[in-house]
Curated annotation (Swiss-Prot):
The keyword Nucleotide-binding does not apply. Mg(2+) binds at H61, H125. It is an enzyme of class 3 (hydrolase). InterPro entries: COD_ChbG_bac, Glyco_hydro/deAcase_b/a-brl, YdjC-like. One of its GO terms (cellular component) is cytoplasm. The gene is chbG. This is Chitooligosaccharide deacetylase. Pfam families: YdjC (PF04794). Homodimer. Its EC number is 3.5.1.105. It is found in: Cytoplasm. Gene3D superfamilies: Glycoside hydrolase/deacetylase. Involved in the degradation of chitin. ChbG is essential for growth on the acetylated chitooligosaccharides chitobiose and chitotriose but is dispensable for growth on cellobiose and chitosan dimer, the deacetylated form of chitobiose. Deacetylation of chitobiose-6-P and chitotriose-6-P is necessary for both the activation of the chb promoter by the regulatory protein ChbR and the hydrolysis of phosphorylated beta-glucosides by the phospho-beta-glucosidase ChbF.
Length: 252
């Protein structure tokens, strides 16, 4: 049985080094899809690069934890900036859901303005769209707009609560991450998905060249290792041997 594999590189638009890494991993590797931060400092550079790489599917990386929002968000920003304190607000059940709904719509419209088309799918920076309070907002929005959504089904209590017309891959993995990045780890992710009987899988990745912005990230040099693995010719062959076809959210 042929299975669909979506290799999605997060953080398009974060920095020039990140952008170049994603393009390299698409052009000479197995990355088929990326998601863009429309408030990223290098988003214009990402748009420019994407014009020369039409095979790269581009979704939207919804941002609520970094940089400046596109709308006024007094309930989520500090000194006008987003940050990781969103976790505390979520634990206290104090998230400004109306502000988040408006920001999602604004980032979506900004994406269309930048790239000239709808995103292939939605996901989010630091997986905040999987917060129980935020997920229904994003799922409803994606279904209404007719675009797919990254879904990590482990935190979900009931798949039956999803909108009937919402598209996603059957499986999602964030396991290709950390200090032990290797080809063996990537293939283990595929084998685990196969054992679960999933016919489609998204694997998250973050290939990049290191620049000053990436150097400031807690997740820095493993991005280079990811790039090496994802552009390995042997990995592409091993994926095909396991019965996977590379694709994007256009295919779900």
């Amino acid at each position: 049985m042929e299975r669909l594999l979506i290799v999605n590189a997060d953080d398009f638009g974060l920095s020039k080094g990140q952008n170049y890494g994603i393009i390299e991993a698409c052009r000479n590797g197995i990355v088929t899809s990326t998601t863009a931060l429309v408030n990223g400092q290098a988003i214009d550079h990402a748009v420019q690069l994407s014009r020369d790489e039409p095979s790269l599917a581009i979704g939207m990386h919804f941002v609520l934890t970094m940089g400046k929002p596109l709308t006024v968000m007094p309930g989520l920003t500090r000194d006008g900036v987003l940050g990781k304190w969103i976790w505390q607000l979520a634990e206290e059940d104090a998230l400004p859901l109306e502000e988040i709904t408006q920001e999602l719509a604004s980032q979506y419209l900004r994406f269309i303005e930048l790239f000239g088309r709808k995103p292939t799918h939605l996901d989010s920076h630091h997986h905040v769209h999987m917060f129980p309070q935020i997920f229904p907002i994003v799922a409803k929005f994606a279904a209404e707009e007719g675009i797919a959504l990254r879904i990590d089904r482990q935190p979900l209590s009931n798949d039956g609560d999803l909108p009937a017309n919402l598209r996603s891959s059957q499986g999602f993995s964030s396991a290709f991450y950390g200090e032990e990045i290797s080809e063996a780890l990537f293939l283990q992710v595929l084998d685990d998905s196969s054992h679960r009987g999933e016919r489609s899988l998204e694997v998250m990745c973050h290939p990049a060249f290191v620049d000053n912005t990436i150097r400031q990230s807690a997740y820095c040099f493993p991005r280079l290792t990811e790039l090496d693995v994802l552009t390995s010719a042997s990995l592409k062959y091993a994926i095909a041997e396991r019965g996977y076809r590379l694709g994007s959210y256009h295919d779900v």
